[in-house]
A protein has these predicted regions:
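C-terminal extensions of enzymes
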Residues: 8, 14-64, 70-74, 86, ...
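Glycine-rich phosphate/ribose-binding loops and adjacent secondary-structure elements
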Residues: 20-21, 26, 33, 209, ...
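Conserved, mostly hydrophobic/aromatic
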Residues: 68, 100, 135, 177, ...
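Glycine- and acidic
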Residues: 193-195, 202, 256-262, 371-374
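Flexible, glycine/charged-enriched surface loops at secondary-structure junctions
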Residues: 221-226, 398-402
């Protein structure tokens, strides 16, 4: 026995390190088995709360749609025009995608909602047999320099590609989404810029309330019976306005609720504080969605606050711009240091890209503008985002979320700490 050891009071065993990696596609239906809801499955809109964390608001659910279940928390890749650029539908599933987001504004102008309807809806059009969601495109319209007029009944604007005059209303958005045919339809809302003052935020919030009431009264008339419709809560980072708006929408005929108007230029701490304060107040029996957030830190904050769904263009847009995201940090693959680096992007990553291709090869493809680069880089980035979320989903269901969340916080710290090995590589 070692000198000084006490056999009656042995030192406690160190806590095992939490599992921070997983296959995000594990447990999901294979691509070949995706398709319309089976007769014995719950009706679209049914939400099963499978587990809730005792130390935070984090939860894991199963949302049923007309094209099968969505296991939450869930990250949704953005396929604005009906495709995630460069990636085949079956490849989306292979890296862990469950539900794809498209944009009703863009699809309404090109190729047009009736054209999408003619071929059988968005699922047949893009050959994606799993769940799909469409955003109204209101955010894109309000971002246009050619915006002509906003009033309480809708928005007049000129299209971004040919300058033709157009109008968007709560009714026109639902009519387009009925033709496009997603499983989840987002209503028209007014999203003000992040730097807006309180008066402007309230004006946008009140207008969104009027549009939400109109959409809720029309949805049963316009949308198909198995399409879900989500309301959108505005209010910026003003917690009083957010609470007020949530209360005004909670009783309307919606199948789920989203927090809009975040990640639009406001300080990140204010955004996270808004998530922490408001997400747990959203109806417990309906899915909770935060629109347009997508850094690893944002997703960790959202899941801890009880959010079920989120989307962002970061995985695909950053990939196209040469940014590869991993548990080690973010790589600028154009950097000359990767010219002779034959390691995978992340040796601990099990994605199809890291299993086969090196940093040097990906750099070579990117420098020469080879389309294969976009495909591979997007697949890798999506895998990271899905894995980051799936690890937390598994932990909530296992009951060890606190330990896993703490482990992921350490990962974030290691990725950003100056002088660290990870930071030196990226």
């Amino acid at each position: 026995m070692a000198v000084g050891a006490d056999p009656w009071h042995p030192s406690p065993m160190p806590e095992p390190e939490p599992e921070l990696r997983c296959d995000p596609a594990e447990g999901l239906r294979p691509f070949a088995e995706l398709g319309p809801r089976r007769a014995d499955e719950p009706r679209p809109g049914s939400l099963e709360i499978l587990a809730e964390d005792l130390a935070s608001a984090a939860r894991s659910c199963r949302l049923w749609t007309a094209h099968g279940p969505v296991e939450t928390p869930c990250f949704m890749p953005v396929g604005t025009y009906g495709a995630v650029k460069g990636v085949l539908p079956e490849e989306l599933r292979a890296v862990g995608s469950q539900i794809v987001l498209a944009n009703a504004y863009h699809l309404s102008h090109r190729p047009g909602p009736e054209r999408v309807r003619e071929v059988g809806g968005i699922h047949a059009f893009m050959r994606w047999p799993g769940p799909a969601l469409t955003d109204s495109g209101g955010y894109q319209v309000f971002s246009l320099r050619s915006l002509q007029k906003i009033d309480d009944s809708g928005v007049d604007y000129r299209t971004h590609f040919d300058g033709a005059p157009a109008r968007m209303t709560p009714r026109s958005v639902l009519e387009a989404e009925a033709a496009i045919g997603p499983d989840i339809c987002m209503i028209l809302d007014h999203c003000p810029p992040g730097e807006s003052d309180r008066a402007a935020v309230r004006e946008a919030m009140d207008r969104t309330t009027r549009w939400a009431r109109e959409a809720a009264s029309l949805r049963r008339e316009i949308l198909h019976e198995d399409q879900l419709c989500f309301g959108i809560v505005q209010g910026g980072t003003d917690l009083d306005l957010r609470r007020e708006h949530l209360e005004s929408l909670a009783g309307l005929d919606f199948d789920g609720f989203a927090l809009g108007g975040l990640s639009v230029g406001e300080p990140v701490p204010a955004m996270h504080a808004t998530l922490e304060a408001i997400a747990p107040l959203m109806p417990r029996d309906k899915p909770r969605y935060v629109m347009g957030i997508g850094t690893a830190a944002d997703l960790l904050a959202a899941i801890r606050a009880g959010v079920d769904m989120f989307d962002c263009v970061i995985p695909s847009r950053h990939a196209r711009n040469g940014q590869l995201i991993s548990f080690l940090g973010r790589f600028n693959i154009r950097n000359g240091r990767f010219r002779r680096d034959d390691r995978p992007v992340d040796p601990g990553c099990a994605c199809p890209v890291c299993a086969r291709f090196s940093r040097s090869y990906l750099r070579h493809l990117h420098v020469h503008n080879d389309p294969l680069y976009v495909r591979l880089a997007t697949m890798h980035n999506l895998y990271f985002f899905h894995e980051w979320v799936a690890v937390q989903r598994r932990a909530i269901r296992r009951g060890d979320y606190a330990a896993v969340a703490a482990g992921l916080e350490k990962v974030l710290g290691a990725r950003t700490q100056p002088g660290s090995a990870a930071a030196a590589e990226v």
